[in-house]
Amino acid sequence: MAKGASISGFPEWLPSERVVEQRVIDTLRKVFELNGFIGIETRAVETGASLLKKGETSKEIYLLSRLQEVGHESDTPIEERLGLHFDLTVPLSRYVVEHSGALAFPFKRWQIQKVWRGERPQEGRFREFVQADIDVIGAGDLPDHYEVELPLVMVSALEELRAYGLPKATVHANNRKLSEGFYRGLGLTDVEGVLREIDKLDKIGADEVARLLTETCGATEAQARACLELAELTASDGAELAAKFDALCEAHGIVKDSEAYTLARQGLDTLAMIVDEAAAIRPGSVIADLKIARGLDYYTGSVYETFLDGAASLGSICSGGRYDNLASQGNRKYPGVGLSIGLSRLVSYMLHTAGAHANRVSPAAVLVAVWNEEDRPAANRIANQLRARGIATDVAPTAAKLGKQIKYADKLGIPYVWFPATAAEGAEGAEPAGDEVKNIVTGEQVAADCTSWEPDTVVAQQTVEI
């Protein structure tokens, strides 16, 4: 990453690092479009009222002000001010409502775009970063099968990135109805508060979460222990999940004919369906993990977190869930389900831990040498002929000594240097009898015609390696 007068949390990739990021973006887009998702881009700003709908605190929102407004921001309510979007879900919900008449539903969209979040920067966490999202939005209703399909699409995309050093990814799924029903069955009423504290489990540990449950959510010690017992449940198939959950309900006196159990069972059935159907298509890719809470209060059903094997310190790299109430227009609701990858964080891991790197900085496969400036038009004609045939080509920036031009190509990783035959009299070195091209990696130099010469496809390709 570029150093110098940097601003904490605002990364700038070096050219070679940008190649890796672009390859990740291209890979994700390819997989998303193979699965029928449509790309969109939304504006960078939303109103404060829209941004606060998701339950974020205003401390994490970057608000915009013109210079002449500095010092007078308090005159305008935060709901009426403009701020940079901190995710892509809030802009999507607004976009769908505004353009509903022009969209076909269910609307399957992918979006890869920068977002801004005013949180404390740390290793792998940024204030400005790229997110990669897929969502499906329905008009009025949305079938449950999308709650299986979306995590499988993300797993498929992450599997493609294993070629660049990414470990195997596993989606951990839960359902908010299951958790809410269980908490209500215990007699707890601050369900949102309990979910927010359970969401901190991996960060602060069970003892601290238990303390917060009793101090902030009104739970007794027994209720707090029961919440933690639920969070410990995992299962790889629906039958195992149902058996473990029913045993826990019985142990804590949650009867099966209660409203709380009925609500929990709705979530359990959906979660079991997700795990079983995912296992039939891609075994081991999705497991039930009842500690997954997603502390944001707009999720209404399935919730997901995605973890990489052997990278526990990285935490979740892809998360999301089902939301039924985020977007509406009059009496019509637009329920959705979506997943989001913190792409910048993922790229940072790939660069600095997995060792992903570009084989060269420049996309050009050929550098056309310039004997002297009078011959630059001829060099440009050769370059244009090669480009017209799909061969990425650059032209030497100056008519420097030939050795310097070759060193320039080498520094950029350009594998071929083209020597034009139309050298002017007095150029350094012997003038070639015709055009020649040199592979500066192997040293091989051969006669070449820009209308027919083909580079070695492996040598010419700009790639990401590990």
From Swiss-Prot:
Superkingdom to which the source organism belongs: Bacteria
Keywords carried by this UniProt record: Aminoacyl-tRNA synthetase, ATP-binding, Cytoplasm, Ligase, Nucleotide-binding, Protein biosynthesis
Transmembrane parts of this sequence: none
GO molecular function terms listed in the Swiss-Prot or TrEMBL record: ATP binding; histidine-tRNA ligase activity
Main location: cytoplasm
Cellular localization per UniProt: Cytoplasm
Signal sequence segment: none
Any Pfam family matching the protein: tRNA-synt_His
CDD domains: HisRS-like_core
One GO cellular component term noted in the UniProt record for this chain: cytoplasm
InterPro entries: aa-tRNA-synth_II, aa-tRNA-synth_II/BPL/LPL, Anticodon-bd, Anticodon-bd_dom_sf, His-tRNA-ligase, HisRS-like_core, HisRS/HisZ
Entry EC no(s): 6.1.1.21
Keyword Nucleotide-binding included in the entry's annotation: yes
Gene Ontology biological-process entries: histidyl-tRNA aminoacylation
UniProt-listed SUPFAM superfamilies: Class II aaRS ABD-related, Class II aaRS and biotin synthetases
Family to which this protein belongs: Belongs to the class-II aminoacyl-tRNA synthetase family.
PANTHER family reported in the protein's UniProt record: HISTIDINE--TRNA LIGASE, HISTIDYL-TRNA SYNTHETASE
Subunit structure: Homodimer.
Protein name: Histidine--tRNA ligase
Native source species: Bifidobacterium longum (strain NCC 2705)
Lineage: Bacteria, Bacillati, Actinomycetota, Actinomycetes, Bifidobacteriales
Gene it is expressed from: hisS
